Structure formats: C-alpha cells, structure tokens
Amino acid sequence: MDDLENNIFNSVEEEIIYWKSVAMKYKTCSEEAQQELQEFQEASREYEAELEAQLQQIEGRNRDLFSENNRLRMELDGIKEKYEEQHSENYVQICSLEGDLSQTKAVRDQLQKYIRELEQANDDLERAKRATIMSLEDFEQRLNQAIERNAFLESELDEKENLLESVQRLKDEARDLRQELAVQQKQEKPKSNMGSPETERMDTSVKASVAIPSAPLTPLSQRGCASTLTSPLSFRTSLDDGYSGTPLTPCARISALNIVGDLLRKVGALESKLASCRNFVHEQSPNRPLTSVSARMNKTREGIENRLSMASGSSVEKGLIKRLEFGSLPSNTPVQGMHSPQGVVKMII
C-alpha cells in the first residue's frame, strides 16, 4: 500500500485508470481464491467420504479377522491333540525302524563282502579284456594289410581298364591318320585312273604301317597319368566316324589282330595274377568278404567269356568285326552297347 500511495500521477484521469486496474486485479485474485476454496472444500468432502468408506471396510475386516482368529485357535487345539497322538505313533514306529536298521546293517555287511568278490572277478575280466584288445589289434593290423592288398588289386584292375582305353585311343589315332592319308592321296592323285603296281603296293604298305601304331607299355605310375578317359559321346562319335572309312588290306587287319591278341594275353595274365592275389587275401582274412575286387573280376571274366562265345553269332559282333575292317556299319546293328567305355573290349574282339 505504501508503494501505491507514493505513486505520483500527472492528472486525475491517470490516477483513476490506475486505481481501476488495481481494483480489477484484486477482484480477479479474490475470484481465483474463492474458486480454489470451493475446489478445496469439494476435495475435502470427497476425501472425508473416502475415509469413512475405508473406516467401514477396516471395521468389517477387523470383525472378520477376529472371527478367523477364534477359528484358528480352535483348529490349533485340534492340531495339538492330533500331534500328541501322532507323537505316540511315531515313537512306536521308531522302535520298529531301529530293529529294521540292525537287520539292514547285517545285510550291508554281506553286500560289502559280495562287492569285494565282484571286484576280484572284475580284475580278472579286465585282464582278459586287455588280452582280447591285444589280439584285436593284431587282427586289425592283419586286416589293414589285407585292405592295402585289396587296394593294390584295384589298382591292377584300373591298369587293365587303362590298357583297354589305350587300345581305343590307338584305334582313334589310326582313324585320324587314315583320314589324313586319304586327304593327301586325293591331293596327289595322278591324272590317270590306273596307277602302277609299285605305287599300289607302296600305298598298301603305308596303310598297314599307319593303321595300328605300336603302343609301348608304360609303368603303372606313368600309365595312370598318360591314359585319358573318353566320354561316351566322344566314343560313340569315333565309332560312327570309323564306319565310313576305307577298308584295310589283309596285312593291316592281321597286324591289328595280332596287337589286340597280345593285349588280350596280357589282360589274361593280369587276371590270373589278380585271382591268385584274391585267393591269398581270402586265405589271410576268410571272415571279410572281398566284394569290390571279386565282383569286378567276376564281371570282367564273365564279359570275356560271353564275348568269346558270342563272337560269331550276334549281329553286334559282326558289325564290330567289320569295324576292324574299316567298313560300313550294317543298318540292323544296334549301337546301344557301344555308348560306354566298357564296350571297348567288344571292339577288340
């Protein structure tokens, strides 16, 4: 109020305006205070109602707890009576269990004695087990030796297959050389259709020498690397190309058959060697079946026997014999049997 009284106004109107603003300010403050008072009164009434409701709930809960306390006291008295009865029964049961315990101790002593006997028997079994393990290691060592020998036999079989593939490769080379020779002969063909007998004999000798080139045998380590496997498609293509060539002379056919016969004799010697090795391995380990080696050898042997027995009867073999003569393939000859490298042996025969 002192600050308000110390204000100096220039005119009465300014003082009136000032006091009006002050009056409005205090009026709004009083209205806000009255509103807060009303809100406080309403909140206090609500809080008082809530407290009364909580008081009623607590009083009801107190009554419930009092009745529950009385019930629990009665239950406690009943439990005490049951406890006394159970205590007497447990005392009788403990006495009987003590008797059972004494009997159980006697049984335990007997079982400990039996366990000692079992330990002695276990020691004997362990000694027998060690002896069995030693014998088993010896047997495994012999079995590994037999497996190594089987691997050697399989490598020999692979060598045999490589020999057959080398025969096919030589025939392919002969076909290529024959085609080159035919091209050269066409280029150098004389004007006259009738050549001299010396020129014909020279061409025949050249064809015989070029048709089947000699293939020296290489060691096993070099032979596996030098021989290349032909796919069924290339093998079939080479057969189809070879049927359209010019026929060889009898000398060339005889030399080719001689080379093929030498290869077959070598293959037969290799098979006999493999058979002897198989018998030796079978004697060393009779309980282990040599499925892979024996199956291959039996399959090869049966194939050779069938080819030897059917060499003169089937139309397929007639067509293959004409293949050695570099003639044309008959139209009724099926080509299905010659789509894989296993058909090389049929071509050899």
Swiss-Prot record:
GO molecular function, a single term: microtubule binding
Where is region (Disordered) located?
Answer: 182-201
Keywords, ordered alphabetically: Cell cycle, Cell division, Centromere, Chromosome, Coiled coil, Cytoplasm, Cytoplasmic vesicle, Cytoskeleton, Kinetochore, Membrane, Microtubule, Mitosis, Phosphoprotein
Pfam families, per this entry?
NUDE_C
Coiled coil located at which positions? 23-189
Q: Where in the cell is it found?
A: Cytoplasm, Cytoskeleton; Cytoplasm, Cytoskeleton, Microtubule organizing center, Centrosome; Cytoplasm, Cytoskeleton, Spindle; Chromosome, Centromere, Kinetochore
The GO annotation for biological process reads:
cell division; centrosome duplication
Under the heading InterPro entries, the entry gives: NUDE (IPR033494), NUDE_dom (IPR006964)
Which domain of life does the UniProt lineage start with?
Eukaryota
> Which cellular component, as a GO term, is one annotated location?
spindle pole centrosome
Q: How is it modified after translation?
A: Phosphorylated in mitosis.
Subunit info here reads:
Self-associates. Interacts with pafah1b1.
Task: Give the protein's function.
Answer: Required for centrosome duplication and formation and function of the mitotic spindle.
Similarity section: Belongs to the nudE family.
Q: What is this protein called?
A: Nuclear distribution protein nudE homolog 1
Q: Which organism is it from?
A: Xenopus tropicalis (Western clawed frog)
Which lineage do the record's taxonomy fields give for this organism? Eukaryota, Metazoa, Chordata, Craniata, Vertebrata
Q: Which gene encodes it?
A: nde1
